């Protein structure tokens, strides 16, 4: 099976993003756009990570998380059409993902390197967050 994924997104806690971003809305619009799996975005942000842990659960696929409540997925089906295909009834998967920015200055100007980090599960994500929290602020 082919998967269409977007593994580099941001949460509502990032600069320049919609304040309407929720995990439910991400799932809804991923389905409309034909995406199977999304990155969670910004798992290093404490409030967002707390919401992710509350609302997502790992199922049979290791490392892929889904909304705990099937009701949210079913509401979208009513939005689409009364005759739905198997593709329309599938759940949106999520992989824990964040981006970090490494900044430095050379003799001429400042530079940034952006790194996307994917994490296989909640315990590893918690370890990553613990490490980064020892290096600086995590709430922005």
Segments (PLM) and residue ranges:
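Domain-core and long-helix interface of multi-subunit machines
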Residues: 1-22, 131-140
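Extended substrate/RNA-proximal surfaces in nucleic-acid metabolism proteins
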Residues: 2, 50-140
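Catalytic metal-binding/acid-base residues of hydrolase active sites
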Residues: 10, 44, 99-101
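Divalent metal-dependent hydrolysis catalytic cores, especially in the metallo-beta-lactamase
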Residues: 28-49
